[in-house]
């Protein structure tokens, strides 16, 4: 881990350690909540060797797995009238570190006596992109498998910095919020999209996490300074990134949110095997509460990522990426919910390095039924099927077009 990366993470951890004593006189105790997630998984694929470029984390043909998928613990405490703190530790199946910090945040939310509201947060947290992953420890109340967009957010996007929001609230509860953030430690965002493509799962990277690259020998034959693993929250150039957007909401009716993100990474910088990836995108989401206890959620993302110096008219790697998802969920009776989601996503190669194919066109369906008992116990039955065309599969002599199915039975206990 390089010095810039470790300095940023050290600041976040130090913040969480020293803050409670500083506010000790006003500290009102700690609340703890979390979850444990147990999973049975079966995968089916056209090719049993289709693992590196599978659309699922547990790729391959005819695999049966039972494991503890995830465990999370969140501690929250009020640090005064306007300040609260929160830190989440996670265990994740296949994680680089068995237990690590997922989020560590200080919230500032002063009481307002006018329609104008100001709040802020400082630390390590997710940018306000997802409208689905709103439950405990960034899980979804609708499905086990996240959408392609939210899967990538969980893998490679996390804010290490500060965010401020200014909102105007009407008496009926309607409000508009404008937000912006500055951050570091996100210079490698885009690595997985370009080298591997999109993937659908429910894994959220922790702050010291890392991912093995697909077909690493081939990647290193072209980019000799690239590490065998990518660190999703590395700082390589010392330049801050930013995002900005707005949110429109009528509570319990409709919510619209959009933002523009730019990590401002220098694509020509390499440090400790980690390249800077200049990644920019626009994200938009709409959530509508419909009659008959129906919920509709649409999310879209369109962006570009670049790495390396110019080769011809483009950066060494220059990839456009896009994704859309549409989820419809219905609460049948108390404690019972069914959800269906369609995802379509892909990447387009702009660069001129023919030895590095990285184009993709894919789509997927997810159907989920969950049953919640006594608030704390939830059973999920889910199937996700994906049809994908990924040109990078040809590097492993695999047909670029693959059909995969993921069956899951999940038991979650919340506390």
What do the PLM-derived regions correspond to, one by one?
Residues 1-10:
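Bacterial N-terminal signal peptides that target proteins for export
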Residues 7-8, 17, 284, 326:
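Compositionally biased regions
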Residues 14-62, 186-191, 195-219, 232, ...:
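Outer-membrane beta-barrel biogenesis signature
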Residues 19-20, 127, 290:
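Hydrophobic alpha-helix-in-membranes signature
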Residues 26-43, 62-196, 247-251, 327-332, ...:
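Outer membrane beta-barrel
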Residues 28, 45-47, 60, 105-108, ...:
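Outer-membrane beta-barrel pore domains
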Residues 108-120, 156-326:
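Signature for the C-terminal beta-barrel architecture of outer-membrane proteins
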């Amino acid at each position: 881990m390089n010095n810039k990366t470790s300095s940023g993470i050290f600041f976040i951890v130090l913040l969480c350690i020293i803050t409670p004593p500083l506010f000790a006189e006003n500290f009102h105790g700690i609340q703890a909540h979390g979850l444990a997630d147990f999973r049975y998984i079966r995968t089916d694929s056209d090719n049993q060797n289709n693992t590196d470029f599978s659309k699922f984390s547990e790729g391959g043909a005819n695999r049966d797995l039972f494991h503890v998928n995830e465990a999370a613990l969140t501690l929250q405490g009020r640090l005064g009238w306007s300040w609260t703190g929160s830190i989440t530790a996670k265990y994740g199946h296949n994680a680089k570190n068995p237990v690590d910090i997922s989020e560590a945040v200080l919230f500032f939310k002063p009481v307002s006596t006018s329609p104008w509201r100001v709040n802020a947060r400082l630390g390590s947290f997710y940018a306000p992109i997802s409208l689905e992953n709103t439950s405990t420890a960034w899980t979804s109340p609708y499905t086990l498998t996240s959408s392609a967009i939210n899967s990538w957010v969980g893998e490679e996007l996390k804010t290490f910095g500060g965010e401020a929001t200014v909102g105007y609230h009407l008496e009926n509860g309607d409000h508009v919020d404008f937000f912006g953030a500055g951050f570091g430690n996100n210079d490698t965002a885009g690595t997985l999209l370009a080298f591997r493509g999109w993937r659908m799962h429910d894994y959220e990277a922790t702050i010291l996490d890392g991912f093995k690259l697909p077909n690493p020998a081939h990647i290193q034959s072209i980019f000799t300074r690239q590490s065998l693993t990518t660190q999703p929250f590395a700082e390589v150039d010392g330049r801050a990134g930013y995002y900005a957007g707005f949110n429109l909401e009528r509570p319990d009716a409709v919510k619209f949110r959009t933002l523009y993100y730019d990590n401002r990474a220098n694509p020509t910088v390499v440090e400790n095997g980690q390249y800077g990836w200049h990644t920019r995108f626009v994200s938009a989401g709409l959530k509508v509460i419909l009659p008959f206890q129906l919920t509709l959620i649409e999310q879209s993302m369109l962006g570009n990522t670049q790495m390396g110096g110019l080769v011809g008219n483009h950066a060494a790697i220059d990839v456009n990426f896009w994704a859309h998802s549409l989820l419809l969920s219905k609460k049948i009776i108390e404690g019972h919910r069914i959800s269906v989601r369609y995802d379509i996503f892909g990447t387009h190669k702009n660069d001129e390095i023919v030895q590095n194919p990285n184009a993709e066109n894919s789509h997927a369906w997810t159907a989920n039924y969950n049953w919640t008992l006594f608030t704390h116990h939830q059973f999920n039955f889910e199937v996700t099927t994906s049809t994908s065309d990924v040109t990078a599969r040809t590097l492993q002599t695999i047909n670029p077009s693959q059909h995969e199915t993921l069956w899951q039975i999940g038991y979650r206990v919340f506390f």
